[in-house]
Regions:
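Glycine-rich phosphate-binding loop and adjoining helix at the ATP-binding site
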Residues: 3-98
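Glycine/GP-enriched mid-protein hinge/lid loop-to-helix segment characteristic of carbohydrate kinases
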Residues: 7-15, 72-177
């Protein structure tokens, strides 16, 4: 595992490029044999245009094109939950024509395959279930809205709840030596 912190800054982008280049250089095949690469990121990804609306708004061109230029290999981008759904659907050995894949990580995402094809929805962003308004709370989500499902039921919400309980004096085995 290579330590890496995804952040919407030039340094994070350059570190990611360096990790990818290092990986490519470690391969025993010639770089020209690599047909394409796909980089999976969380958040809103438009696979048709190659834009990420969540990360690396650093250049005037689509993110997929930036990766292609900097890596030297045709690169596509995809939402992480949809990529996981693809992997599970095609690599999981299941005999099904439809699938749902729930990704509960730092945020919440859903990948949907219908008749073996990824479902993107009308806007191209289907599966962003973490931003469905569900709660009457004053917690501001990463998307800027209040009350999203992610504010109470996601990795970052669980961490926030844990920290609040510890600050209130609740004991936890996690805090023991």
């Amino acid at each position: 595992m290579i330590p890496f912190e995804l952040d919407n800054h030039e340094l994070s982008y350059q570190q990611l490029i360096a990790h990818i280049q290092s990986f490519i250089n470690s391969l025993t095949i010639d770089k020209s044999a690599i047909v394409a690469a796909c980089i999976n990121l969380s958040g809103r990804i438009n696979t048709q245009t190659g834009y990420s609306y969540s990360y690396f708004h650093l250049h005037e061109i689509p993110l997929a094109d930036s990766f292609t230029n900097d890596i030297g290999i045709t690169t596509f981008i995809e939402n992480d939950s949809r990529a996981m759904a693809y992997g599970e659907f095609f690599g999981g050995g299941y005999d099904a024509s439809h699938a749902l894949f729930l990704n509960m990580d730092y945020g919440l995402g859903l990948g949907m395959l219908l008749d073996g094809k990824m479902y993107y929805g009308k806007s191209g962003f289907s599966g962003e279930i973490g931003h469905v308004p569900m709660f009457q709370n004053e917690i501001i989500c990463h998307c800027g809205k209040k009350g999203c499902l992610e504010t109470e039921a996601s990795g970052w919400a669980l961490l926030r709840h844990f920290k609040e309980k510890i600050e209130q004096g609740v004991s936890s085995a996690v805090m023991r030596n």
